[in-house]
Each structure stands twice: as structure tokens, then as C-alpha cells.
């Protein structure tokens, strides 16, 4: 998502460099603990994610982890919470161009497993659960704005709202690529990006970056041993 976050990820690499910054995509590559990785800032929403996936895969990528931010719905959730996605309610449109709405948007199990394992090894608290992803940031029917929609997602136990994971999971499934996602909460169920929570959010963002890098490293090493 955020271009600044892609740079933060790249800063953890030993020899990162800017590959390109064009048409809204900021792309960095480098090595993390000896493993070659790429960090790509895609902007907001499903269409830009789908394009990034297609073009990065054309260059050889086959495993994708979204490191993002999200809103939350459930009582007790707060800024900085780390959420590892087990699936996504499909409220966007881009994924429908690949597979029908009945097809579930879920991460690859091996990626999910390594993200959970990384969080536990790093002693980073986390939540796992299903979220919702849609295209309309200011849509009047969004759960944050429509009481009926909000009650539905609360009752369903959904733990996050963002704009990209439905596309990530469905496009990945269509092509046979491995995918996963985790987010740092940027608010509470009643406050969107409160000023008092900014420091906690930045801590959670850094936690997500660490978990993603450790998880990707584990996947790459397992591939090398296979």
C-alpha cells in the first residue's frame, strides 16, 4: 500500500536500492539475511494491487505478502494491534474479473503458518481472523459509515477493514501464487486514526514489517531446502 512503508521495509534490507518509482508504484529490491526480496508500494485499492502482482510475477515473483494498515470493528481492538488475515469478505470489484464472488478470498496456508510462526518467535502479540476489503474509501455503505453494515460485520466477527487483500488472495489463487497478509490497526471500533494512537500504530507497523520479513525468509529457505 503506502509508498513510505515500502521504503521502511527496504531499509531493513542489507543492500536495498530503488528499482523504479513510476505510475504510482515505488519498488525496492535487496537482500534480507541473505534472501533476495522486493518491496512494492502499490497505492490504494484492488486495481493497482492486481497490476503489481501480474507484473512482479512476470519478473519471477511467486510469493506475495501484504504489509498494511486497517480499521477495526471488535470491542477491545486498538491502534497498533497486529492482525494476521485468515480470509477476507469480498466487497471489492477487481477480484471479480478473475474469479466469481462465490470463490473464497483466503491466503495460502504455508504463508499464513509462517507469519504466525514468525510473530510467535519474535514475541509479537497478534490476532488472526477474517476481515473485509472493498474499493470505495468514502462509500456511504461502508461499515464505518452505515450502521446496518457495521452491525453485520461486528456480528460476523470480522476483525479488519482495508482495500487490497481480497484482490491479493483471489488473484494469487487464480494464478497459483502464494499470498498472505497482515495489518497494523490504525484505530478503534469508534475512532478512525485517532491522534493519540499514532505512536502505537507506528509500533504496530514496525511489528508487521518484522513479521513479514521473517516469514518471507522462512518461506524462501524452505524453498531452497525442498
Question: Predicted regions span which residues?
Answer:
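Active-site rim beta-loop-alpha module in soluble metabolic enzymes
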Residues: 105-155
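Short acidic/polar active-site loop segments enriched in Thr and Asp
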Residues: 62-63, 159, 178
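Zn-dependent metallopeptidase/amidohydrolase metal-coordination segment
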Residues: 166-200
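Flexible, glycine/charged-enriched surface loops at secondary-structure junctions
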Residues: 15-21, 123-130, 219-226
Amino acid at each position: 500500500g503506502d509508498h513510505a512503508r515500502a521504503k521502511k521495509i527496504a531499509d531493513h534490507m542489507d543492500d536495498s536500492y530503488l528499482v523504479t518509482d513510476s505510475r504510482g508504484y515505488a519498488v525496492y529490491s535487496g537482500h534480507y539475511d541473505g534472501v533476495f526480496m522486493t518491496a512494492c508500494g502499490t497505492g490504494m485499492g484492488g486495481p493497482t494491487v492486481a497490476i503489481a502482482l501480474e507484473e512482479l510475477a512476470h519478473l519471477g515473483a511467486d510469493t506475495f505478502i501484504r504489509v498494511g494498515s486497517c480499521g477495526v470493528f471488535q470491542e477491545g481492538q486498538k491502534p497498533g494491534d497486529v492482525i494476521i488475515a485468515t480470509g477476507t469478505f469480498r466487497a471489492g470489484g477487481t477480484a471479480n474479473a478473475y474469479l466469481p464472488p462465490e470463490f473464497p478470498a483466503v491466503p495460502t496456508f504455508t504463508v499464513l503458518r509462517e507469519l504466525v510462526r514468525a510473530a510467535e518467535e519474535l514475541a509479537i502479540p497478534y490476532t488472526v481472523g477474517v476481515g473485509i476489503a472493498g474499493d470505495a474509501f468514502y462509500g456511504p455503505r461502508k461499515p464505518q459509515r452505515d450502521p446496518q453494515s457495521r452491525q453485520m460485520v461486528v456480528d460476523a466477527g470480522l476483525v479488519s477493514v482495508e482495500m487490497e487483500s481480497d484482490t491479493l488472495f483471489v488473484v494469487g489463487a487464480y494464478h497459483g501464487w502464494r499470498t498472505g497478509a497482515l495489518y497494523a490497526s490504525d484505530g478503534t471500533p469508534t475512532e478512525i486514526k485517532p491522534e493519540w494512537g499514532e505512536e502505537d500504530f507506528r509500533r504496530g507497523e514496525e511489528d508487521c514489517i518484522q513479521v513479514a520479513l521473517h516469514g518471507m525468509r522462512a518461506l524462501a529457505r524452505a524453498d531452497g531446502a525442498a
